[in-house]
């Protein structure tokens, strides 16, 4: 496989040093005090004078296990690999310390007996499984044996737990043996100290430059314009390669940006450097993209287009990626479709990153067929597992996992959340060590309205990499839903400090900033053509409330105004309310206390309200409301001087976004001695969902009874309504946080009233709703209803409206 000269050639010397240096510090004898002749021999051996110790060991017939391990290590230091093997074979049945087996493993490796070396590494690791030096020794030997993929997998596992420069050097060594010289150069570049000069370059880095045809970069005097452009291009390419952290990628990109700035000054007005100047202009797009400067990428691209410069495919891909990150998915989709489709078929050689960008360019452009095409292509062309060369071990195929992750995401965006959940759960539980899949699963649970279940899954994911950016972003979203305001703020502050340009972080920060704004709520209705006895003709009902920004996380103050009027046979009724109060929001709890000055019939009377709810879990909620001078008293009653106090309680059961039911009971004690009891049951059953259309069945039952009969307001002795309805929500347009939809509703049922029998109830409604930039949510609905009142069917045509505005 490899010639024996590789044993001592320069390209492997540093790997050998990496191991033996670790073993020098591992000898327990070296840690003891100099208190006898044996210790003195060991210390001399550590200084390089190994012969006295080796002679002493050779003359001894009885040695302890620790002394045997010392012999093996010192023989290794002396370069006597065969002697190490001979000593080991003599004592192989002894239970040696791990350092002894490690010394033998190094000796076998030096003799190119890879399998024997791997066996000894396994013995050493069985005794000290967390020893990073032994793990690296095994990894380097796997690379020597040609098992590059296995070595890289193990190195990735080691690096996730203990990233350091030694791991980068090991990575470069593996890539060098595998012939992947660009990856080798990337790893060596990352291992360099910042601002290293050419005189300080280590031998391995110089060799990596040579392997990448960049040897001239070693000598500044040999830097021709073409070579300088090559170096700039190579730095840009390296900045896109996966590394241990974003900061390393940024550091490489910053080197490229600094080189561009210098070369741009030199070549801008030099006609002899036109070709090289155009090259660095294109490569500059990539460096800006790595640095998350998406708007700069786009503006630089537009300047190049104006000059007529031709942009090669890789440059166009960088621009498309910038458009996608800058929330311009249709432009990204247009460029990527040209690049990655050939006669409506996806190119077969796309990387995982290219597939992901193509997928999201379709998805975020609301092109669901295109997203499904990419998904099916990814799944159909990728086996679930990859078998590593030269070993029976197989590992999960990241591309296959990505394809099924696409499947879950498409289902989620297509409003098929059960399918999204099933796919995401299967992926997460079949790959428990994959943190990204666990985070995706939690995101689907959150979308289904189960934030506590999502929180539990994120806790499991936290074990793998606690400070993963995507993990903390998802945890912050869950905290916002659970009203854990302080936790959300801490997580958001952390990710903003670390990755301020990350699109997920930008989106989260926007949500937290909006949460901290003041809020205006307006809601009401106005009658157009009404015959009903409750609200009168041409009635108006309006409530306006302003909430303060959050105070000490959980508190908000509010103040507002309410107005209601209606025309009755006995005259016009008008009620004005001036109100103020406080709101408390914390995990599982919402409370609101309000004081109101109610003005009607030329009188001022104090009213009050206390409302609240408590969540037991993701499924069950109980709530209650107590009100003095209740708004449950009809306007007509107040016109006639009748007021009342009320109490209400309810229970809500929420299975998921497709099914929920609520039961409520209300009691109103009128000032004219009437007592009203109301019980209602309302539910929702989703019967159809697609990307743009959702249809729900809305069953509704209502029962009411009153103790007084002869009153100036509508007051049936007993009444019972059954009015099932359907509601269809049709998405007209959507772009990220902005949307516009229309809502149709229709219901037909029956109403029974004591002494008046049963008659038909019909309802129709049409409305539109718009959401904009997270700060505006507004809608209006035209409703028509016809129902019996004391045996006469009367109609009511009115408009409902509401708006929430953050400022």
From Swiss-Prot:
This is Poly-beta-1,6-N-acetyl-D-glucosamine export protein. Its main location: membrane. PROSITE patterns: TPR (PS50005), TPR_REGION (PS50293). Residues 1-26 form the signal peptide. It is a multi-pass membrane protein. TPR repeats lie at residues 98-131, 165-198, 279-311. It is found in: Cell outer membrane. Exports the biofilm adhesin polysaccharide poly-beta-1,6-N-acetyl-D-glucosamine (PGA) across the outer membrane. The PGA transported seems to be partially N-deacetylated since N-deacetylation of PGA by PgaB is needed for PGA export through the PgaA porin. GO terms for biological process: polysaccharide transport; single-species biofilm formation. The keyword Transport applies. Contains a predicted C-terminal beta-barrel porin domain and a N-terminal periplasmic superhelical domain containing tetratricopeptide repeats, which may mediate protein-protein interactions, perhaps with PgaB. GO terms for molecular function: poly-beta-1,6-N-acetyl-D-glucosamine transmembrane transporter activity; polysaccharide transmembrane transporter activity. Keywords: Cell outer membrane, Membrane, Repeat, Signal, TPR repeat, Transmembrane, Transmembrane beta strand, Transport. The gene is pgaA. It comes from the Bacteria. GO terms for cellular component: cell outer membrane. SMART domains: TPR. Pfam families: PgaA_barrel. Induction: Levels of this protein are negatively controlled by the second messenger ppGpp (at protein level) at a post-transcriptional level. Increased levels of c-di-GMP lead to decreased levels of PgaA. Disruption phenotype: Deletion of pgaA does not prevent PGA synthesis but does block its export. The synthesized PGA is retained in the periplasm and accumulates at the cell poles. Disruption of the pga operon causes severe and persistent defects in the biofilm formation process.
């Amino acid at each position: 496989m490899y010639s024996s000269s590789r044993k001592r050639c320069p390209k492997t010397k540093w790997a050998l040093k990496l191991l033996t240096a670790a073993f020098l510090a591992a000898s327990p004898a070296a840690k003891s005090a100099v208190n006898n002749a044996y210790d003195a021999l060991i210390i001399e051996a550590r200084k390089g004078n190994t012969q006295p110790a080796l002679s002493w060991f050779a003359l001894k017939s009885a040695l302890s296990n620790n002394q045997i391990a010392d012999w093996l290590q010192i023989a290794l230091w002396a370069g006597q690999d065969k002697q190490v093997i001979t000593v080991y074979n003599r004592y192989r049945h002894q239970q040696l310390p791990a350092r002894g087996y490690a010394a033998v493993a190094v000796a076998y490796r030096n003799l190119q007996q890879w399998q024997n070396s791997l066996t000894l590494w396994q013995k050493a690791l069985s005794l000290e499984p967390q020893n990073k030096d032994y793990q690296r020794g095994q990894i380097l030997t796997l690379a020597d044996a040609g098992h590059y993929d296995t070595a890289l997998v193990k190195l990735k596992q080691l690096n996730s737990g203990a990233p350091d420069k030694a791991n980068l050097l090991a990575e470069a060594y593996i890539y060098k043996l595998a012939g992947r010289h660009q990856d080798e150069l990337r790893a060596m570049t990352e291992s360099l100290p910042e601002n290293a000069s050419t005189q300080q370059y280590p031998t391995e880095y110089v060799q990596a430059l040579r392997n990448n045809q960049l040897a001239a970069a070693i000598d500044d005097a040999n830097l021709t314009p073409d070579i300088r452009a090559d170096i700039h291009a190579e730095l840009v390419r390296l900045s896109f390669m996966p590394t241990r952290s974003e900061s390393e990628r940024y550091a490489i990109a910053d080197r490229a940006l600094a080189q561009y700035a210098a070369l741009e000054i030199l070549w801008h007005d030099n006609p002899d450097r036109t070709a090289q100047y155009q090259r660095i202009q294109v490569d500059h797009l990539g460096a800006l993209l790595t640095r998350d400067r998406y708007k700069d990428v786009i503006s630089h691209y537009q300047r190049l287009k104006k000059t007529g410069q031709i942009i090669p495919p890789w440059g166009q891909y960088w621009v498309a990626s910038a458009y996608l990150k800058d929330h311009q998915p249709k432009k990204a989709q247009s460029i990527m479709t040209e690049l990655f489709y050939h006669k409506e078929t996806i190119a077969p050689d796309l990387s995982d990153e290219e597939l992901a960008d193509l997928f999201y360019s379709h998805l975020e452009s609301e092109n669901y067929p295109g997203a499904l095409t990419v998904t099916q292509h990814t799944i159909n062309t990728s086996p679930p597992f990859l078998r590593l060369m030269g070993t029976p071990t197989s590992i999960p195929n990241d591309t296959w996992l990505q394809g099924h992750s696409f499947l879950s995401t498409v289902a989620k965006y297509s409003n098929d959340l059960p399918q999204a959940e099933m796919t995401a759960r299967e992926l997460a539980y079949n790959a428990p060590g994959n943190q990204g899949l666990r985070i995706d699963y939690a995101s689907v649970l959150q979308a289904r309205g189960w934030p506590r279940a999502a929180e539990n899954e994120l806790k499991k994911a936290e074990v793998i990499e606690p400070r993963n950016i995507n993990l903390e972003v998802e945890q912050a979203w869950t905290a916002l839903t659970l009203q854990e305001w302080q936790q959300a703020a801490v997580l958001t502050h952390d990710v903003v400090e670390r990755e301020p340009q990350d699109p997920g972080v930008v989106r989260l920060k926007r949500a937290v900033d909006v949460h901290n704004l003041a809020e205006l709520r307006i809601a009401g209705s106005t009658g157009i053509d009404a015959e009903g006895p409750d609200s009168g003709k041409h009635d108006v009902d309006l409530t306006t409330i302003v909430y303060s920004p959050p105070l000490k996380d959980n508190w908000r103050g509010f103040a507002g105004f309410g107005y209601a009027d209606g025309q009755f046979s006995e005259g016009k009724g008008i009620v004005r309310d001036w109100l103020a109060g406080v709101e408390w929001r914390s995990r599982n709890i919402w409370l609101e206390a309000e004081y109101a000055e109610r003005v009607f019939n030329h009188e001022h009377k104090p009213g009050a309200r206390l409302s609240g709810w408590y969540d037991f879990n993701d499924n069950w909620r109980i709530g209650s409301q107590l009100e003095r001078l209740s708004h449950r008293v009809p306007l007509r009653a107040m016109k006639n001087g009748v007021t009342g106090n009320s109490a209400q309680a309810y229970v809500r059961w929420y299975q998921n976004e497709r099914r929920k039911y609520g039961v409520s009971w209300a009691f109103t004690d009128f000032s004219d001695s009437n007592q009203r009891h109301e019980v209602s049951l309302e539910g929702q059953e989703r019967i159809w969902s697609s990307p743009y259309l959702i249809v729900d069945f809305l069953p509704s039952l209502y029962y009411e009874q009153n103790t007084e009969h002869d009153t100036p307001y509508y007051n049936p002795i007993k009444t019972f309504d059954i009015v099932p309805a359907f509601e269809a929500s049709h998405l007209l347009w959507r772009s990220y946080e902005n949307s516009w939809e229309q809502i149709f509703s229709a219901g037909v049922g029956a109403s029974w009233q004591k002494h008046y029998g049963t008659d038909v109830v019909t309802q129709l409604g049409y409305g539109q709703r718009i959401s904009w930039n997270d700060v505006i949510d507004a809608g209006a609905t035209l409703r028509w209803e016809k129902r019996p009142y004391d045996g006469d069917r009367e109609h009511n045509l009115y408009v409902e409206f509401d708006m929430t505005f953050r400022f």
